[in-house]
């Protein structure tokens, strides 16, 4: 019996609950709840409160700065993109001024050219006759030089041809006279026909000379030579 009691006591002690605060009830009053305290001393509790407060405040500050910095970066990035797009779409002020100046110059250039072209045309039209009038006088000098050259060139062979014609006519006349005296009437008729051909040839030569040198007919020297040639041919015909 004694052993049974001792074993029951030893086994019953661990089964008992440790001393501590009573569990909260649904119907517990606020006064009873507020009167209870956290376990531990008051100093350790203050340190715990400080550590928790500092960590929470640091976390909040870090998150706040991170969010604000992210927003600022995004806003800066957006503004940079907007400025770049504006710069690409719109040229700077210096280029705008240059473009405006170039456009004004291009618009003024046709007007200036048109205004300058009209006086130039009006001035060139009256100047043209003056230039022609100034250049026209040398033409008579050239014309005078050309006839003089033609006269000189044509006058040189003229005396030789006239002399040859006169010599031929005199020879023909002497031969015909001698033949006429020696031969009979038939030969005289033949000689007369030959003289007619020579006479026809001599005026033909004179006509050819006149046609070849139209300018010589105007000069006095050419007229004298032609008169002498014609006189020689007439004398030959008269002798015949």
Swiss-Prot record:
Keywords from the UniProt entry: Membrane, Mitochondrion, Mitochondrion inner membrane, Mitochondrion outer membrane, Transmembrane, Transmembrane helix
A GO CC annotation given for this chain: mitochondrion
Membrane topology designation: Single-pass type IV membrane protein
Stretches of the chain found on the membrane's Cytoplasmic side: 1-45
Superkingdom per UniProt: Eukaryota
Spans traversing the lipid bilayer: 46-64
Compartments where found: Mitochondrion; Mitochondrion outer membrane; Mitochondrion inner membrane
Stretches assigned to the Mitochondrial intermembrane side: 65-240
Keyword presence, Repressor: no
Any coiled-coil regions, as ranges: none
Biased composition (Basic and acidic residues): 73-87
Gene Ontology process terms (BP): anterograde axonal transport; axon development; axonal transport of mitochondrion; cellular response to gonadotropin-releasing hormone; cellular response to hypoxia; cellular response to steroid hormone stimulus; cerebral cortex development; negative regulation of dendrite development
Region entry Disordered, spans: 72-240
Pfam families according to UniProt: AIF-MLS
Statement: the UniProt record of this protein carries the keyword Transcription regulation: no
InterPro entries: MGARP, MGARP_N
Feature: compositional bias, Low complexity: 166-183, 228-240
Main function: Plays a role in the trafficking of mitochondria along microtubules. Regulates the kinesin-mediated axonal transport of mitochondria to nerve terminals along microtubules during hypoxia. Participates in the translocation of TRAK2/GRIF1 from the cytoplasm to the mitochondrion. Also plays a role in steroidogenesis through maintenance of mitochondrial abundance and morphology. Plays an inhibitory role during neocortex development by regulating mitochondrial morphology, distribution and motility in neocortical neurons.
Complexes and interactors: Interacts with RHOT1/Miro-1, RHOT2/Miro-2, TRAK1/OIP106 and TRAK2/GRIF1.
Name this polypeptide is given: Protein MGARP
Natural source organism: Bos taurus (Bovine)
Gene name of the record: MGARP
């Amino acid at each position: 019996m004694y052993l049974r009691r001792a074993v029951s006591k030893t086994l019953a002690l661990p089964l008992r609950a440790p001393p501590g605060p009573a569990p909260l009830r649904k119907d517990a009053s606020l006064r009873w709840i507020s009167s209870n305290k956290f376990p531990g001393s008051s100093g350790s509790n203050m340190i715990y409160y400080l550590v928790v407060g500092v960590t929470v405040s640091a976390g909040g500050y870090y998150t706040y700065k991170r969010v604000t910095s992210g927003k600022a970066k995004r806003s800066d990035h957006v503004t940079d993109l907007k400025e770049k797009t504006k710069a690409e779409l719109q040229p700077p002020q210096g280029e705008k001024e240059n473009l405006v100046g170039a456009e004004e110059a291009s618009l003024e250039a046709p007007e200036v050219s048109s205004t300058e072209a009209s006086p130039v045309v009006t001035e060139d039209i009256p100047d043209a006759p003056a230039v022609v009038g100034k250049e026209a006088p040398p033409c008579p000098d050239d014309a005078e030089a050309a006839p003089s050259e033609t006269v000189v060139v044509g006058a040189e062979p003229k005396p030789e041809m006239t002399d040859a014609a006169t010599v031929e006519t005199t020879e023909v006349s002497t031969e015909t006279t001698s033949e006429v005296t020696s031969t009979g009437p038939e030969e005289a008729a033949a000689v007369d026909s030959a003289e007619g051909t020579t006479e026809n040839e001599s005026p033909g030569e004179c006509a050819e000379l006149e046609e070849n040198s139209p300018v010589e007919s105007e000069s006095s020297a050419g007229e004298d030579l032609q008169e002498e040639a014609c006189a020689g041919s007439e004398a030959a015909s008269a002798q015949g």
